[in-house]
Amino acid sequence: MKLTVKLLDIENRGVLLHCTDARSMRVRDGDRVQIVDEATGKTAQAHVDTTGSLIEPGVIGVYRPVNATLAVDEGTPVEVRGAERPASLEHIKKKMDGGRFTKDDTVDIVRDIVDDVLSPGEITAYVTASYINGLDMDEVEYLTRATVETGERLHFTRHPIVDKHSIGGVPGNKITLLIAPIIAASGLLIPKTSSRAITGAGGTADLMEVLAPVSFPALEVQQMTEKVGGAIVWGGATNIAPADDKIITYEYPLRIDARGQMIASVMAKKFAVGADLVVIDIPVGRNTKIATAQEGRKLAREFIDLGERLGMRVECALSYGESLVGHTIGPNLEVREALAVLEGATEPNSLIQKSLSLAGIALEMAGKAGPGQGARAAADILRSGKALEKMRQIIEIQGGDPNVKAEDIVPGECRFDVNAPQDGYVIELNNSALVTLARLAGSPYDHGAGLLVHAKKGTRVRKGDPIFTIYADREWRLERAIEVGRTLMPVLVEGMVLERIPHERWV
């Protein structure tokens, strides 16, 4: 059927048909059509929405993402015809029924995700099926390789290339802002592609964006890394492992991070940037993704095994995950805390020690420090000011202000102190509840939003002492966080005597 294009400036991978045209073509909402610009030969496949009033018969509404492929002008005549269901839908249905993906199944699915053949609902079905039924190690390898092969790769002439990753689950984990410049200052290359927050209140890319732009094409990431030793960028802008970033888009609203997909996501990006040596941080503890050390060791073995399949040397570190790293959650607050350490601050100890330990593992793997001497070598680089200077170089080459100081980074203007209800000790910090409050306050999208935790687990407090402060850029977000915070109880305070049990209760 010949239809005339009407461009619709809406972010939707589909087209809009008048219901009479849809009936003539025997297509319904959710079906697919193929659009062909016969003048240029360009084609695109899209799912269908129908309307009886928004457009006229004889017109096809083309949403912005579809026209990124077609590149047609308003009023262009195009040929529109029904399209077959992609085979990848049958593969997804098989996984929903408890089956397993073959290598070819995985290639079909990943290619259709990258080419925008699958609708948002279909990608969500894939994410959910993989989450519920899991992926075995062969399926994880298939997904990793397919994710890399459908995107760009970096090719360095100097080796080894070092990379690190934290699987998340613990708030305030701003360690990359220290580890990357320490490793780069040692003379190694670290092209750190990072993701934005999925279930947390700020991914590394969200934090780095406070200091400098993070969206760069792959070639520029390689050039920046070769010039100054490192970069901290958003992987979603590089076309490195593009399927992964699209999958993350659908994991985010569900707040799920399927284990097999998580392993493939991490390792695909490391493989694509040419990493030889990889350090994986696995936080362990209640209210984290990994509850026990036994489970953490199992996950570590899976990372190491996949690394061997891909030709990378991987080492993992189980880290304490029952309390936030440092005292801050949210982009501006975390960046300010990390910059202060680079500038010479000796607190917070949890941030400094974790960063030095993980950087030290990388230095030992690369032969820059002897066995057991890595953390000390990393500390020497930090204390000497070389890491700060390297971070300034990274900020500058990415287009930020290299002279920025910790004191220049300020939290949101709206704030609320949550005070201790009684004298006692902080006996628990609920990570997931703290993250929920930070997100309600606007983090990570509002850079000034987040939490400053004054009293961590084991701290003695007096009634009325501030336990944590909520910051927000907008008053209504702060009010919402306060309202929900009254029911979440993210921090528990108890006296040394937990409960009095009188004689009368047992008479």
Swiss-Prot record:
Identify which residues the record assigns to the active site.
Answer: D257
Enzyme superclass (EC): transferase
Q: Which Pfam families match?
A: Glycos_trans_3N (PF02885), Glycos_transf_3 (PF00591), PYNP_C (PF07831)
Q: Which GO terms describe its molecular function?
A: 1,4-alpha-oligoglucan phosphorylase activity; AMP binding; pentosyltransferase activity
Keyword Glycosyltransferase tagged: yes
One of the GO biological process terms:
pyrimidine deoxyribonucleoside metabolic process
Mind telling me which Gene3D superfamilies this protein's record contains? 1.20.970.50, 2.40.40.20, Nucleoside phosphorylase/phosphoribosyltransferase catalytic domain (3.40.1030.10), Pyrimidine nucleoside phosphorylase-like, C-terminal domain (3.90.1170.30)
Q: Which domain of life is it from?
A: Archaea
Q: Does the keyword NADP apply?
A: no
Any idea of its EC number? 2.4.2.57
Q: Where does AMP bind?
A: G169, S195, R196, A197, I198, T199, G200, T204, S265, K289
Could you list this entry's UniProt keywords, alphabetically sorted: Glycosyltransferase, Transferase
Q: Which reaction does it catalyse?
A: AMP + phosphate = alpha-D-ribose 1,5-bisphosphate + adenine; CMP + phosphate = cytosine + alpha-D-ribose 1,5-bisphosphate; UMP + phosphate = alpha-D-ribose 1,5-bisphosphate + uracil
- GO CC annotation: cytosol
Q: What does this protein do?
A: Catalyzes the conversion of AMP and phosphate to adenine and ribose 1,5-bisphosphate (R15P). Exhibits phosphorylase activity toward CMP and UMP in addition to AMP. Functions in an archaeal AMP degradation pathway, together with R15P isomerase and RubisCO.
Q: Which family does it belong to?
A: Belongs to the thymidine/pyrimidine-nucleoside phosphorylase family. Type 2 subfamily.
> What is the protein's name according to its record?
AMP phosphorylase
Q: Which organism is it from?
A: Methanoculleus marisnigri (strain ATCC 35101 / DSM 1498 / JR1)
Origin organism lineage:
Archaea, Methanobacteriati, Methanobacteriota, Stenosarchaea group, Methanomicrobia
